[in-house]
Amino acid sequence: MEKTVLLLATVSLVKSDQICIGYHANNSTEQVDTIMEKNVTVTHAQDILERTHNGKLCDLNGVKPLILRDCSVAGWLLGNPMCDEFINVPEWSYIVEKASPANDLCYPGNFNDYEELKHLLSRINHFEKIQIIPKSSWSNHDASSGVSSACPYLGRSSFFRNVVWLIKKNSAYPTIKRSYNNTNQEDLLVLWGIHHPNDAAEQTKLYQNPTTYISVGTSTLNQRLVPEIATRPKVNGQSGRMEFFWTILKPNDAINFESNGNFIAPEYAYKIVKKGDSTIMKSELEYGNCNTKCQTPMGAINSSMPFHNIHPLTIGECPKYVKSNRLVLATGLRNTPQRERRRKKRGLFGAIAGFIEGGWQGMVDGWYGYHHSNEQGSGYAADKESTQKAIDGVTNKVNSIINKMNTQFEAVGREFNNLERRIENLNKKMEDGFLDVWTYNAELLVLMENERTLDFHDSNVKNLYDKVRLQLRDNAKELGNGCFEFYHKCDNECMESVKNGTYDYPQYSEEARLNREEISGVKLESMGTYQILSIYSTVASSLALAIMVAGLSLWMCSNGSLQCRICI
């Protein structure tokens, strides 16, 4: 009879109504890294590192780039005859120059402070070329014979279009005194130069005067140049050299020139009509007839991701450059949680619902929720409130990362002349160091955010579990796997009240108490039976052992093996 009662009680426990707390799971194989773990499979993840580009040069926000093709910046500004297509250029978004353009300074020489001029151009979007000293105004000097075979055009000798090489006229080179007043409202880029002959004979042949000079002055510039006559190897068929200079002439300022020979005078200057963000990119790409918001020397980027690893030099609304190969942000939950019977903490942030047995693929309309079973059936239901709060918490995670790294180090494509190579090497090391630190910060932040996100989800499951536990109290039993077994009947209406937090504990407490006591009574009665059996077994075993010892002693006494003495 006792066995029958115990069996019925056990069956009734198995079939009791239950409610379980769990979380969403799916077939995702996406993995993320955290501070504590690598390759954690999650239900949802977002790649935040852009790795692709289109391999083309594109318009930037509808404005075409100035692609110099085979011309250099110097060839364009001075007017190399092979760069006539760039005599007048419209507004540009950025400038593209090849690494080694063929049409540079056709007459050999150098451009003074060339790198600084390029840096200036990275803040300019439009030039307007204006004539400041007409070529026809040099009545006392030969302004037409200053050409060279080094600068050919249509098979004939020519020269830079925007400057004039002045030669003696009628065996005389009168001293030049010429001024230009900048009456424009914009700054003016003015260029001029000096010719360094090969020998004294060439000096007098071209300029008559054996000793010459060039003086240039503005409100901020005071320059005096003299030619350096020396024998040099031929470059482009020329033993002479030319050196070019530039300055920015402010509005209402004047530039004064004085020279008695070797002067390369400005004819045109560039009015800076629009300033803005620009850059000079070194690229061999061709124009792709496309539009973009972000351009790199490798191609255009069309992405909403916060980071990229394509090239450190960019222009436009671009993701931030890092050296990383992988940055994946967790937005969902662990998809393969540990299955444990006891609570366990892991991670850095908050409590972990490690006692939950596993995720539910059957729950598709939320991240966290319930599974119930009673006489009316069973089913899954998402907890809308906790799910929505979690969604709100991770929706702005990408923006949060950007805000935390809101000071981007910009790698600027600087150029250095031969005398500044050590500075260039130091600059490259500094840029590499900055990028290394920037990359480390980005990777560390993603790892920490992933750890925080996964712990955040686990904590939400734990909070949902505690919400149910505090409602049910002793009306249900905790099974240790995220489930509760009711001590009373709980129909669908009852289940719904548990889910929405309106469970009426007093309503079910009496039924739960009776069932709980009945189960406890069965256990106690069974325990008493087991105690009686245990005592009986112990006494019987002891008695049998005593009889065996007594019999053995009598046998040994009878055959003389043991002497027995009874003393009274």
Swiss-Prot record:
It is a single-pass type I membrane protein. Disulfide bonds join 20-483, 58-290, 71-83, 106-151, 294-318, 490-494. It comes from the Viruses. It is found in: Virion membrane; Host apical cell membrane. Glycans are attached at residues 26-27, 39, 181, 302, 500. Residues 1-16 form the signal peptide. Binds to sialic acid-containing receptors on the cell surface, bringing about the attachment of the virus particle to the cell. This attachment induces virion internalization of about two third of the virus particles through clathrin-dependent endocytosis and about one third through a clathrin- and caveolin-independent pathway. Plays a major role in the determination of host range restriction and virulence. Class I viral fusion protein. Binds to sialic acid-containing receptors on the cell surface, bringing about the attachment of the virus particle to the cell. This attachment induces virion internalization either through clathrin-dependent endocytosis or through clathrin- and caveolin-independent pathway. Plays a major role in the determination of host range restriction and virulence. Class I viral fusion protein. Responsible for penetration of the virus into the cell cytoplasm by mediating the fusion of the membrane of the endocytosed virus particle with the endosomal membrane. HAMAP family: INFV_HEMA. Major glycoprotein, comprises over 80% of the envelope proteins present in virus particle. This is Hemagglutinin. The gene is HA.
